[in-house]
Swiss-Prot record:
Fe cation binds at C98, H140, H144. Its cofactor is Fe(2+). Its EC number is 3.5.1.88. The keyword Ribosomal protein does not apply. Belongs to the polypeptide deformylase family. Binds 1 Fe(2+) ion. This is Peptide deformylase. InterPro entries: Peptide_deformylase, Peptide_deformylase_sf. Removes the formyl group from the N-terminal Met of newly synthesized proteins. Requires at least a dipeptide for an efficient rate of reaction. N-terminal L-methionine is a prerequisite for activity but the enzyme has broad specificity at other positions. GO terms for biological process: co-translational protein modification; translation. It catalyses: N-terminal N-formyl-L-methionyl-[peptide] + H2O = N-terminal L-methionyl-[peptide] + formate. Keywords: Hydrolase, Iron, Metal-binding, Protein biosynthesis. HAMAP family: Pep_deformylase (MF_00163).
Length: 189
């Protein structure tokens, strides 16, 4: 089932998400719906807060980026209760976009490597060291479960320059190919 994407300005995107337990209701169905919604909206990642749930669940498929970023080849994950344990010292700046911030792309500086622990959809524990763009994708999605957005990492001047676009998103004056929930009313369209 396709789920609507919550847009910038909706309060759920600013909540720090909670860990869940293996008995979370209809978890497999939720993961399948999140994955379907991610693909339908041409995303490479989706976090549960982006569909209105303040829980620590991420779905990622960065494989479509493999031509430009070989480290993304086959990089498909479901990450539950993810926690970044360590961030590398080396930084890299790349453009990022977000389904919750349609039509906005800005340069964001992030560590080039991270160490993350999480459980998969079967609640099997994992710890991985990720590099390059795969690390960037995970950090971007991870921000969502910590109540952050990629625009929180841009300069105040850049944020001022996109203020009009951000206001339009809040007001729902944005076109997308996917269903959205706008702020502050939460009205679906």
């Amino acid at each position: 089932m396709l789920l609507p994407i919550y847009l910038y300005g909706h309060p759920v995107l600013r909540k720090v998400a909670e860990d869940i337990t293996p008995d979370y209701p209809k978890l497999k169905e939720l993961i399948a719906n999140m994955t379907e919604s991610m693909y339908h909206s041409d995303g490479i990642g989706l976090a549960a807060p982006q569909i209105g749930l303040p829980i620590r669940v991420l779905v990622i498929d960065a494989d479509p980026l493999k031509e430009d970023y070989p480290e993304c080849a086959g990089f498909k994950r479901v990450m539950i209760n993810a926690h970044i344990e360590e961030r590398g010292e080396d930084l890299c700046t790349e453009y990022e976009g977000c389904l919750s911030l349609p039509a906005i792309h800005e340069k964001v500086e992030r560590p080039t490597s991270i160490r993350i622990r999480y459980v998969d959809e079967d609640f099997q524990p994992h710890e991985e060291v990720l590099q390059g763009f795969a690390a960037r994708v995970v950090q971007h999605e991870y921000d969502h479960i910590d109540g952050k957005l990629f625009i929180d990492h841009i300069s105040p001047i850049r944020k001022q320059l996109i203020k009009g676009k951000l206001q339009n998103i809040i007001k729902g004056k944005v076109r997308t190919s996917y269903r959205v929930v706008t702020a502050p009313t939460g009205k679906k369209r």
